[in-house]
Amino acid sequence: MKNKLLKSKDFLQVFDLISSKGFKSNGKYQFQGIDAWHDFDGYTCWLSYKDLTITLLFHGKLGVEYENVDTFDEFYKKINGLIALS
């Protein structure tokens, strides 16, 4: 698996993968430990893993919040793996 620098479109690709292959529970899709959900109009989407949350905003803007660097590293590896599968 090749690690790549992730861009907004990569996170949107992962969001689509999770929402299509995952299962829905309490308004969130779940797949391989990652949750994905969106607001009522779909303009804002979120991905979460442990203490990390990615906010995907309209026009390709994105926000990343996490408490532990290890969580970010784990998430980065998971995302790269999911992108490689799709």
Predicted feature residues:
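Negatively charged, low-complexity tracts enriched in Asp/Glu with abundant Ser/Thr
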Residues: M1-H38
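Residue-level signal for functionally critical sites in structured catalytic/ligand-binding pockets
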Residues: D10, K24, T44, S48-K50, ...
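Short, structured protein-protein interaction patches enriched in aromatics and acidic/basic residues
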Residues: I34-S48
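Intrinsically disordered, low-complexity regulatory segments enriched in Ser/Thr/Pro
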Residues: Y49-E74
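Mixed-charge, Lys/Arg-enriched low-complexity segments
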Residues: D70-S86
